[in-house]
């Protein structure tokens, strides 16, 4: 006899901005929220911004270092704050027994044009994200 789920598993994309992940306590609070959502039977793709005013700090640092701001390098700099936040979020989720993997935009399958600082999405191939979700990550 096969069992049929009464409620299909939902795939939720949840986005949390810089204030929501602005310090370790807030990161843990978001992780708790995600854990509850997963325990309700949902799959979650979590998107986080850089912590608090991290992006502003990075932009000020760029100004302090250089009077020129090549677009590609500014994009690389800005993603440093986002990478920090997503790595810390994955660590908090691991502490709650939820294995999680972080992905940059390109690792997640987003293909953009080369208009740095204002790129447009050309295509999305979320294969790596699907594999991680199917593995319970």
Label each region the model flagged:
Residues 1-137:
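Nucleotide/pyrophosphate-binding catalytic subdomain
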């Amino acid at each position: 006899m096969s069992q049929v789920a009464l409620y299909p598993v939902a795939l939720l994309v949840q986005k949390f901005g810089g204030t929501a992940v602005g310090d370790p306590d807030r990161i843990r609070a978001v992780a708790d929220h995600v854990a509850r959502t997963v325990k309700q039977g949902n799959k979650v793709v979590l998107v986080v911004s850089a912590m608090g005013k991290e992006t502003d700090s990075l932009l000020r640092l760029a100004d302090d270092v250089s009077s020129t701001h090549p677009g590609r390098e500014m994009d690389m700099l800005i993603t440093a704050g986002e990478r920090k936040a997503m790595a810390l979020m994955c660590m908090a989720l691991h502490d709650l027994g939820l294995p999680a993997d972080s992905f940059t935009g390109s690792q997640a399958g987003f293909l953009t044009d080369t208009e740095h600082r204002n790129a447009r999405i050309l295509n999305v191939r979320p294969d790596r994200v699907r594999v991680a979700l199917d593995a319970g990550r």
